[in-house]
Design a protein with these regions (language model features):
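A short beta-turn/loop motif at secondary-structure boundaries
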Residues: 8-11, 66-68, 110
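Flexible, Gly/Pro-enriched loop and linker segments at secondary-structure and domain junctions
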Residues: 71-115
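Active-site-proximal acidic secondary-structure segment that organizes catalysis
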Residues: 1-4, 29-40, 52, 101-144
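Hydrophobic "lid/gating" helix adjacent to the active-site nucleophile
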Residues: 1-18
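Helical lid/core segments from catalytic subdomains that handle acyl or acyl-like groups
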Residues: 22-84
Length: 144
């Protein structure tokens, strides 16, 4: 695993770094969920990682795994209690924002159709409009 990347490096597998709420007061732990090609395996592994959160440990430990760069992850904040129409994301740009940040909101039924807001902050050098639209099409397929 490389610790430094530039725009010419190719990463064939990424993880999801996401905060998981563990208490009603908003306390959360960041976890790293490895990528698996099939959803069943991903779900099983993600559930085990989330169930195994130790509330006495450092809630940011997962962000320290693999170095401080976080260049092999997609950052995902899930806000299932919030339905939004617009969201502005901020990041500490240590590396020029060359990793995507996504926020997925509350799925609701509007006009008889299941919809879910998704906001993404991306660097055009990392993801172009074509591939971003393919992602949104895949989300639409899952919501049908």
């Amino acid at each position: 695993r490389k610790t430094k990347m530039n725009y010419m490096d190719v990463v064939d597998m990424i993880a999801v770094a996401t905060p998981i709420k563990v208490a009603d007061n908003g306390r959360f732990f960041t976890v790293r969920l490895p990528w698996y090609p099939d959803f069943k395996t991903f779900y099983t592994e993600a559930k085990a990682i989330i169930s195994g959160i130790d509330p006495d440990k450092d809630p940011y430990e997962a962000e320290k795994t693999g170095g401080s760069d976080l260049l092999d992850v997609v950052l995902l904040s899930a806000t299932p209690d919030l339905y939004f129409t617009s969201l502005t994301c901020t990041q500490e740009h240590r590396h020029g924002g060359n990793y995507p940040l996504m926020n997925a909101g509350k799925a609701v039924i509007r006009g008889g159709v299941l919809v879910m807001p998704i906001a993404m902050t991306i660097h055009h050098g990392f993801i172009d409009g074509h591939h971003l639209s393919l992602f949104y099409k895949k989300v639409e397929e899952f919501l049908k």
